[in-house]
Amino acid sequence: MKSIKTKIIVTVILCSLVSTFICGAISIVNSVSTSYEDSQQEMQLKCVSQSDELDTMMQNVSQSVEMVYSIAVAKLEHAASFRTSKDYVDTYTKQMLPILMQSAQNTKGALTAYIRYNPEFTEPTSGLFLTRDNSDSEFESVTPTDFSMYDPSDVEHVGWYYIPVQNGKETWMEPYLNSNIGVYMISYVIPIEVDGESIGIIGMDIDFSEFTDTIDSLSIFDSGYGFLVNESGKVMYHKDLEIGSNLADADSGLQSVVDALGNEQTEETAVSYTYQGKDKVMYYKTLENGMKFLLTAPKTELQEKSRQLAKQIFGGAAFAMILTIIIGTVLGFTITKPITQIDGIVKQTAEFEFASNPANQHLYKRKDETGRMAISLHNMRKNLRQMVA
């Protein structure tokens, strides 16, 4: 038959283990869920803040062009003369040169700046074209592109002029490679219209690396990164994929990303997908120029904090269980020790051994039930000794 000591130890340990297990399990489930949500929120905020930074860069460009546009329209006092007088056009161009030059020099990343006129009533090389090879060099004025050499439908060479004119509003062009200097550029162009008639355009070409360097400097968790696409999933910038390729063509798992880009309700929300066999999560935000900035990371990295927290809770629970076993064992021995001593006294009494044991004296001083039992047993032994005597 099991002793009271064993029963007490087992009871204490079982109760402690059950409570520790239940509390630990609840803590792990809730903490893991909360930690994963925190990782998602961190990723969403990172996506928004990075998008805002890119938008700020674009706004600096658009503000520069819009300032030149406002001055250009204000100085265009006689639109009719602009159509018929070469001298008027030349004078106007000279007035705009220092204004365009100053604006271009003060715009970070600007490589070209231009004011071009409608080739239907001006010379095919009319206007201004400022260019430089990199952001550290000075702008120089060169002869503008000869419109007579290209058909208006030639998007590659003169799309930067005709597309904004056809749109009838300010337009961000998609990034393109300037083969002359081997640099990817992105353009912001505003058409000039007076009384509903197209006069020309004003625009700037910005070194696209100003944007991509910012994206490359971004990191999230261990291997998360950002990239740019347009609304249809065409790659504008990606560290692994070729510019101009489509996400859906790169990996079938990316079709869900393309689908999400066309759904406004998914913007700034977590979108799960697979890429190269890995489960990933992405957030995206639409930029000022219509491009989409995407921030992506492996799902396992979002769950890493959850796993670490679960390990800590599990480790704490395991330590608590071990400590409980030790404390339960010590308490069991402590609680049952006086009972064991009283049991020994009872056995001595049954064998009529009435000799006093100094080791049992402390039992009489106890204030609990064992103390009262010891005193009662002492009195009984005393009476038995008198009877035997």
Regions found by a protein language model. Name each.
Residues 17-21, 292-346, 350:
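Cytoplasm-proximal transmembrane signaling helix
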Residues 6-10, 15-91:
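Juxtamembrane extracytoplasmic/periplasmic/luminal helical "stalk" adjacent to the first N-terminal
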Residues 334-382, 386-389:
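HAMP signal relay modules and closely related sensory coiled-coil linkers
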Residues 82-90, 103-170, 174-182, 234-252:
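Extracellular/periplasmic ligand-sensing ectodomains of membrane signal-transduction proteins
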Residues 178, 192-194, 275-277, 287, ...:
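Sensor-regulatory modules in signal-transduction proteins
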Residues 210-293:
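Intrinsic low-complexity, intrinsically disordered coil/linker regions enriched in small/polar
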Residues 55, 73, 100-108, 215-221, ...:
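Short regulatory alpha-helical segment in sensory/regulatory domains of signaling proteins that mediates
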Residues 181-217, 281-283, 292-301, 305:
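Conserved beta-strands of PAS-like sensory domains
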